[in-house]
């Protein structure tokens, strides 16, 4: 296996593992610090020599879940309790990681491009539950990325509009994702990947980001397929993309909390000062019942229209899709799903699939209903991630053989879809497995993982 690869900016050297090579912490854009804070990602300068891609780099600035928090404490216990998988933090954070399976020279492997969740306020590319080994065993390259989040990634304000040639602001985190996706499209063939077979997938805010990328003209024809896990917006009010004007109103509130009177003063603020104002803004928004508000916006450029309008017009990318939920996303049991009684997020998935049927491209729907072993929490938001990445061995829970069997089935379905656009693949996992049909009005099939 070749652990040294030449990219368009220089040579990178990864770490050889059993059957694959992992490249950790490859920069895909300049560090967005100083004058580059709240600007679109800037192209890297070329480097000389070999970049040692052997360490996961900084996560982007965020407030990590605390163990004592009444709600987020459960996420700390589940995903953030191992210091080995919690890297440093800083504004210098635009890095990606690549897991490459052993392959023949000249072979072009399918590529999975993962966008983490975290409510557009947190999360990072090297979380405990993310790893590419299981995908590599199936012959798929995995890429995971960092992107700016919270006030660093989605702050919109007229001051920022004024310095932008398109008079827009706020979508820096999405522009990071697009820059990373284009970096992959431009470089992945040197790693053995197929630049024409890239599947964009994500969970929660990462799923919503996937919908944005599939609704934006800036991504062109790069995404060949997409998977949206627990986060899609068609007609309901649960998830939304505000207009630029609406997001600028949030920005005005944030400015008031900082006490600053110019963009220069804002860029001179320390991360600690910015976070203090951000926490105040979050508290204010939650008290008024508005919840998550520092999010991507329809600025007329990154998103010409809101994702809901794009869905209504049917102008999202015309590619195969997979989308689904876990039980606690929607408050419905598997029995209710079979009886046609589903919650909001599953209804959104069905609306999306109906639009795909009209366009003649498939959409595959699923419901993850497996109760995780352990003394708490059941089938919770994000619980499927251990299974889709095949990382059960890292989890604190007393996993049993049925958990490993379910994970094997899900990894196989996900990677089959990434290869061919069909989760069933060329061969079934087991002869007795029921075929996963695409969703149509005549056959509203939802695959249940339990």
Task: Label every PLM stretch briefly.
Residues 264-269, 426-435:
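Short, flexible loop/turn segments with low-complexity composition
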Residues 21, 91-94, 175-178, 182, ...:
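A structural signal for well-ordered alpha-helical segments within the folded catalytic domains
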Residues 28, 47, 385-387, 447:
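Bulky hydrophobic/aromatic "packing anchor" residues in well-ordered structure
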Residues 225, 233-240, 257, 261, ...:
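Substrate-gating cap/lid region and adjacent catalytic-acid/histidine neighborhood
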Residues 79-260, 311-330, 358-361:
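Serine-hydrolase-like catalytic core of hydrolytic proteins
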Residues 148-150, 201-205, 367-375, 429-437:
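Short, solvent-exposed turn/loop segments enriched in Gly/Ser/Thr/Pro and often Arg
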Residues 431-450:
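C-terminal domain-tail junction helix/linker
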Residues 1-171, 195, 288, 401-410, ...:
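Non-catalytic accessory segments of hydrolases
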